[in-house]
Every structure is written in C-alpha cells, then in structure tokens.
Amino acid sequence: MKKLFECIPENYFNLFAGKNRGFYAEVAFLLYEQFHINRAGILYSLMKDEVQELIETKEELGECIDIEDEIEEKEQDSAGRANEVLRRLKKLKWIDVEVRDQFEEFIVLPVYSSRILAVLKEICENRTIEYQRYCFTTYQLLTGVEAEERPASAILESEKYSEQLYDELTILLHNMKNHMETIAAKDDIQQVLEHHFGEYKKDIIDKSYHRLRTSDHVSRYRNKILERIQTWFLDDKFMKRAAEDAVESGYSANWEEAMDGLSKKMYRVEEIYSNLDEICNQIDARHYQYLRAVLDRSRYLSTYNDSINYKISYILEHIGQMDENILDSSLFRLVQLRQLQEASLLSPRKKKGVYEPEQHEVNEISDEMREELKAENIRRMEKVMNRKKIQKFVLEAMKGRQEIEMSELNLQNEDDALYLIYVYLYGYSKGTGYKLSEEPPEFITQKGYTFSNRTIKREN
C-alpha cells in the first residue's frame, strides 16, 4: 500500500486552508458537477464563466471574496479573479489543463480529484441508504452467473459490498451517538423538540433506521449468503477453480497467494453476515438511549425552567443587558419581607400510638352444621375425577377380559360421558392398569356422543 502523499500532491489540501475555503469548496463542487456533464473534458472558457458567475453572485449577496490576498498579482474584475481561481486549482494539482484542436484548452480531473470530490459530495448530500441493496448485490454475485464464470471476481466484489454494508451500519451507529451529544448540549426544551422531530427524524429515522428495521431489513438474504460461503469452503474443486481464475485475471501473482487471499475475503464476508444481529441490536440500543436522552433532557429543562433559580438567573441576565440609566430610575425591591406567621411553619411530627387490634369474637359451630359440611365435602370428593376412579371404572367395565372396545363402556348419563375424556387422558400413561391401542380407530356415535372407538387392553 502506498503512502498518502505518494498518491496526491503534498500541498493538495492547501485549497481549504485560507479564509476563502468555503468559496473554494463551492468551486470544487461546481467543477465536479461539470465533470459529470462533460466526461471527455471541461472547456476552460466554460468553467471560467461558471466561476465568474459564482463570484458575482457572492458579491451581490454582500459576501466578500478576497482572492487578491492569495495571489501575487491583483485582479480587479470578476473575470480576472475567475482566471486566478482556475490557475490556483491547476497549481495545487486539483485539475490538469490540456490543449487540443484549434488551441482550445480543456480541464481534466485527475483520478484522485474525482474520487475525493465524490466522497466530499456524498458526505454533504446525506443521502438515503439502501442497506438491502448491498445484501441483494452480494447474494446475486454469489449465486448468479458471475460465480460460475468468474468465481474470483464474484468473491472479491461480494467482500467489497459486504464491507460497504458494515461501514454504513457503523456510520449509522456513530451518527446516533452524535445526535445524543447534540441533545445533551441543548439549553431550551423547544430546541430539543425541534432537533428530535426535525434533524433526527429526517436524517436518522426516515433515511436509515426505519428502513433498516422494516422493509429494508438486512437479514433477508443473510442465511442464503452464509450457506453459499460455507458450501464453497467445503468444495475443493471450486476453491481451486477460483484460485486459477484469480491468477489468470491478475488479482494474484501465484496459486498459493490466490488461495490465501480468497479465503480471507470469504472469511470476512462470513464474519460480517454472522455478526449482523449484533450490530443491529447495538443500533436498536443506541436508538433507545437517544430517546431516553431526549425524554430526560426535556423533563429536566421543563422542570428547570419553572424553578426559582432559572427565573432569577433569567431576570439578572436581562438586567445585565439593560441600560444603566433605566436601572437607576426604576429601582425595585428584589425580596419582600413579611411578618412570620404560624401557618407557614412546619408542623411538628406526632408520635404514632401503639396499635391495639379489635377483640376477636369466636362463634361456636353446632354439631349439626359440622355434619352438614362434612357430608358436603364427601359429595364434592365423589365428583372429582382422579386416576383411581377412572381405573376402577374401566376395569369394572372389562369384567375380567383382557381387552374391550371403548364402545363397551357403560355410559348411562352425561357424567359418564365425561369419563371418556379421562379414559383417553390416562390411557397412554403408566400405572393406570390399562392402555389404549395405537391402531387408527373408527369414529362412532353412541348415545349422542361421537368418539374414536379405540381398543382398551389390560395392563400386566
């Protein structure tokens, strides 16, 4: 890997070092916009007119562009200053100038300038992130025709898109933290609410978080991607073919280097998609931390704004901004003193007396009532269904036989029909004295009840 200033000029970023850095940033974005319109080269005179128009617009708005302080020769008109701006861009190696047919000059962006401007423009635009696009593209690369015809390219590209997905999720996590710090610095509850329902909702909720956790969920293709990567790891023929493709395509110098590089890329893809739940959970936790921070800050500011300390500090702050003559002519008493009244004093605490419970009266129960309650309990116990009662019912119906069908059970009334449910319930457990057969039964109707006519066998 090369060093940074082996790839770009050493004084490249001096363009943004002066007091006109905001103006030069606009010129750079204007240059990048024209680069997209004229890919083969920007006509020098056209770019000069664009810069001249920008300078004149700034001056009409009352902004001062002191380009003369940064150049050796002073230019008075806007056309001359536009020329100096382009000459400075050329001197700092932001642009190259080519002379073509009929001595026309064209501006060409070096590779590093076009890439740096693309990154800067992306930062300023704060675009909506399509997280699922990275997953879908990775899935297509690993399962499409590219994986069969150019496996090395498919692996390298899938690792690149996986890294971009992970970077975007990490950026979202850090952006939430920045919004938390912004909320903590707000001094007014109105500012807190405006930031939450304005910037946070627009930049985080609408553009990233809501899509991430609903329609754009990143876990949709995760299992298929992991399955394909793990299958390739176990396929020696595919790995050899991918290594040969990497050597033939120039990605690697030899077969061993290709195998090592492709394995690392595949491990990285597997690691990213295996840890997706973890980073998504961190994003959820950070979002809830932000919401708690908004609530706590709003609650604190609403309480503080109603306090005496805030009101006094607010009055003193405005007094400090007033004219001294007004203060001299309109003095007022800050504290009003009144006679002490007994009602304003805190009442002394009274000692709590000893608790004295009410006397409990014991009512005697007659023998007749005791016998009646006892008989009621016996009747209630007789109605309770239990294992022994069901076992007795079934064995009495079998009358010494080894097996019978459930239709042979003696069903006399509705209470007996309830026994069928418990015969099923205990028929497949141990210790009941009987068991039900496993064969598919026939359904029959007997005395108005439909049930499966299973065979009951005596348990040895």
Swiss-Prot record:
KO phenotype (gene knockout): When this gene is missing the Wadjet system does not confer plasmid-transformation resistance in B.subtilis.
InterPro entries linked: JetA
Highest taxon in the source lineage: Bacteria
Matches recorded under SUPFAM superfamilies: Glyceraldehyde-3-phosphate dehydrogenase-like, C-terminal domain (SSF55347)
Coiled-coil zones: none
Role, per record: Component of antiplasmid transformation system Wadjet type I, composed of JetA, JetB, JetC and JetD. Expression of Wadjet type I in B.subtilis (strain BEST7003) reduces the transformation efficiency of plasmid pHCMC05.
Name the record gives this protein: Wadjet protein JetA
Underlying gene: jetA
